[in-house]
């Protein structure tokens, strides 16, 4: 804790020191996407396309059935947080497709 005032008593008591800045531990990077992983996943997505449940979820998102899409994905994937992340990913894909279609016209 950084000392604000050189006092003998109270919350701010003690000798004034500069805090050591430690670099974050290696275990903190778990789950962060690397460039290589992102490249591989994008390549696989380009080759394989979307799974059938993802296509159906995208159809639900197209007709603004966001809650129904979330429930559907949660049933297929298993957890609420992963389903929310998948729904967000698919809605971003739809937005990109819409943007590309508008740019082409």
From Swiss-Prot:
One BP annotation, GO: translation
One GO CC term, this protein: ribosome
Entry GO MF terms: structural constituent of ribosome
Subcellular localization, as worded in the UniProt entry: Cytoplasm, Cytosol; Cytoplasm
Keyword Ribosomal protein: yes
Keywords carried by this UniProt record: Cytoplasm, Ribonucleoprotein, Ribosomal protein
Gene3D superfamilies for the chain: 60S ribosomal protein L36
Free-text function comment from the UniProt entry: Component of the large ribosomal subunit. The ribosome is a large ribonucleoprotein complex responsible for the synthesis of proteins in the cell.
Subunit organization: Component of the large ribosomal subunit.
Similarity comment text for this entry: Belongs to the eukaryotic ribosomal protein eL36 family.
Record's protein name: Large ribosomal subunit protein eL36
Species for this entry: Xenopus tropicalis (Western clawed frog)
Gene of this entry: rpl36
